[in-house]
Swiss-Prot record:
The gene is dxr. 1-deoxy-D-xylulose 5-phosphate binds at K126, S152, E153, S179, H202, S215, N220, K221, E224. It comes from the Bacteria. This is 1-deoxy-D-xylulose 5-phosphate reductoisomerase. Mn(2+) binds at D151, E153, E224. GO terms for biological process: isopentenyl diphosphate biosynthetic process, methylerythritol 4-phosphate pathway involved in terpenoid biosynthetic process. It comes from Burkholderia pseudomallei (strain K96243).
Amino acid sequence: MQKRLTLLGSTGSIGDSTLDVVARHPERFAVHALTAHRNGEKLVAQCLRFAPDVAVVGDAETAARVEAQLRAAGSRTQVAYGKQALVDVSKSDGCDTVVAAIVGAAGLAPSLAAARAGKRILLANKEALVMSGAIFMDAVRDHGAILLPVDSEHNAIFQCMPRDAAEHGGIAKIIVTASGGPFRTREPATLASVTPDEACKHPNWVMGRKISVDSATMMNKGLEVIEAHWLFGLPSERIDVLIHPQSVIHSLVSYRDGSVLAQLGNPDMRTPIAHALAFPERVDAGVAQLDLAQIATLTFEKPDYARFPCLALAIDALEAGGVASAALNAANEIAVDAFLSRRIRFTAIAQTVGAVLDGLSNRTPGGLDDVIEADAAARRAATAFIGKLPAPGVERAA
């Protein structure tokens, strides 16, 4: 039976890769809804190619522009806008599968709506679990949703794990691999001077600018540790991080009998996307077969927490529980935006997140409202902290 998709965040890198796979298998996949924030031009092009029932954008002005272009081209795709429209297409009877690829906290509400509607969810938005892990997983369980990880690391772990629960599968630990990003070997004393463009030049993966910066700080890997905790039910002490610069081994599962299973492949997001889209079957993703003889060497090293303080901060937040992970994510989003806007130095990202966590009044969230409140409070605290920092290139007066 043909799967009908709602693709949240269709104009981003995950959206591009998803639609590439979808286009290869029109007999298997059809598109119910595509969503974007403000990239109307790209969304129009996608709508004309994939003919979704609905297109959703962030605001009325973009919606009017998109609708005018679609009507001029003869498209019947309906156009909606705003947060509620995202929720509506995520729980719509017109789709059975939701690809959650909106970057950041904005993806939480529609992803949660999909879970509560019992959808098959392909989760690329890690913030849904980072911010509200227990709430989200409860919704998945209580409403019979199917959750399939799209992040390459978590998809790899999923492929290497038995289908039963971790505690009954003889699992000792899971090992999340990381490339180390563009600054793995850079002298730490020079990190304060790196530019946004340098931070966004990932050595292996093609990604958006926000997640590229998260990779450079290794906050992305910290968020993935938190996500792995909720997806696979393992405590932080049974989740290791391993630097693997070639990005060929996407993650590993270590068993109590000494066996280690790993998932390998070329660094191309179409592979985990195709796996999740077609699961439990396999389909062509358009990705070249891995040639280990050509690669020849795979190397590994332990992460340097002094070089990557954001990784340590994320693990600390996971162990603290409560709303600490939500605060971590919110502060990081504010700090990364400030860095990309050249308002703070690269090294101030970790400083900002650390300051927000130090000032956090942690508590166990009673529901989604508590998570949203913690998110907002952390954003205010991060903004206030950044406001007191000197601009890049400006030293404080003695």
